A protein has these predicted regions:
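Active-site groove signature of glycoside hydrolases
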Residues: 97-118, 139-152, 266-267
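A short acidic, helix-capping loop that chelates divalent metal ions and anchors anionic groups
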Residues: 11-14, 74-80, 113-117, 151-156, ...
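Basic- and aromatic-lined ligand-binding clefts that recognize polyanionic substrates
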Residues: 138-174
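Conserved beta-strand positions in the central sheet of alpha/beta enzyme cores
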Residues: 38, 68-70, 106, 144, ...
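Active-site cleft segment of glycoside hydrolase catalytic domains centered on the general acid/base Glu
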Residues: 116-129, 153-160
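Histidine-acidic metal/acid-base catalytic patches
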Residues: 1-33, 160-308
Length: 308
């Protein structure tokens, strides 16, 4: 397995404010104990070839790979012309992935719009993804459908956030060019068991997000549900250092290895800076190598007395 980093701590600086360039992030990340960097499509200032060539050169100078591009297509838009534009935009990002040397490009279902039924939305999503498969094959890029919560810059949460909808879409498309991007924290946010989801998709996992989200003290999942349909992430939701949250990562990695997974693990962390990404990397590396840390045993008293 190889380790990549995704900088949640710098999302707005890279995407919205543009106070940090992608080249700045590549330089900063070169000191992290990772082999690659996962990019969000919003990190790219332009898709012009000259700019992309500069990005590729910067990665090469720092001996870093760009294995996976985090794209956010929205295939539940009711207007067919808008859905077509989303398909064409995703194709462009597949091409960018290949140009930068990546092998995986994220694909999503889209936003869970109140006016779109489950049946209609699933139909649109399956149709849209199928339109991408031949192009993905041509470029040698596998589409990775994430069990997603919500893009940072969406209004509504993921249409396929719930497991049954996610699997309904994924299982309709039997292609080597579509796999699962597994994120255990997103399953928890959906009110579901991440281990149960992994058991169902483990043979199709092509990329993994390592994250540990948590609700800020005093807040509940029910409260999160009530504020999901607003722009961006809820203020009560936060990322934490991987290994310090609710996910059972030793078990997750054991299941991945048993399924033959040997791909990329991308740290989705660092909300409070690079130090947290480093902590996450130090936690994950032994698990990736098959080393499971066991809790220390509680010392037992010698020669216990009856009733003692």
């Amino acid at each position: 397995m190889k380790l990549a980093a995704f900088p949640k701590c710098f999302m707005d600086q890279l995407v919205v404010e543009r106070s940090m360039s992608l080249f700045d992030w590549i330089a900063m990340a070169s000191d992290l104990p990772v082999e690659g960097l996962e990019f969000h499509h919003g990190f790219l200032e332009t898709l012009d070839e000259a700019y992309l060539e500069g990005v590729r050169s910067a990665l090469e100078r720092r001996h870093l790979q760009m294995p996976m591009l985090c794209a956010s297509p929205d295939f539940t838009k009711p207007d067919p012309e808008e859905r077509h534009r989303e398909v064409e935009r995703e194709k462009r990002l597949i091409s960018v992935t290949a140009f930068l040397g990546g092998s995986y490009c994220r694909v999503l279902s889209g936003q869970r719009r109140p006016e779109v039924s489950r049946e209609q939305g699933a139909l649109w999503v399956v149709e849209s993804i199928r339109e991408l498969l031949d192009y993905a094959a041509e470029k040698g890029v596998v589409l990775a459908m994430e069990n997603h919560y919500k893009d940072n810059y969406w209004t509504h949460p993921e249409f396929a956030q719930r497991r049954e909808v996610y699997l309904e879409i994924l299982n309709q498309i039997d292609s080597p060019w579509l796999g699962a991007q597994y994120d255990p924290s997103n399953a928890i946010l959906a009110g579901e068991d991440p281990i149960e989801l992994l058991e169902l998709v483990k043979r199709r996992v092509v990329t993994v997000h390592a994250s540990d989200r948590f609700l800020k003290p005093g807040h509940t999942l029910e409260e999160l549900r009530s504020v999901e349909d607003s722009a961006g992430y809820a203020a009560i939701l936060s990322h934490g250092v991987v290994g310090q949250g609710l996910n059972n990562y030793p078990r997750i990695f054991r299941m991945l290895r048993e399924a033959g997974y040997d791909g990329w693990i991308s740290i989705e962390d660092g909300i409070n800076g690079l130090g947290e990404i480093l902590e996450s990397a130090e936690f994950l590396r032994p698990l990736m190598q098959g080393q499971v840390k066991r809790p220390p045993e509680t010392p037992r008293p010698r020669n216990p007395q009856p009733g003692g």
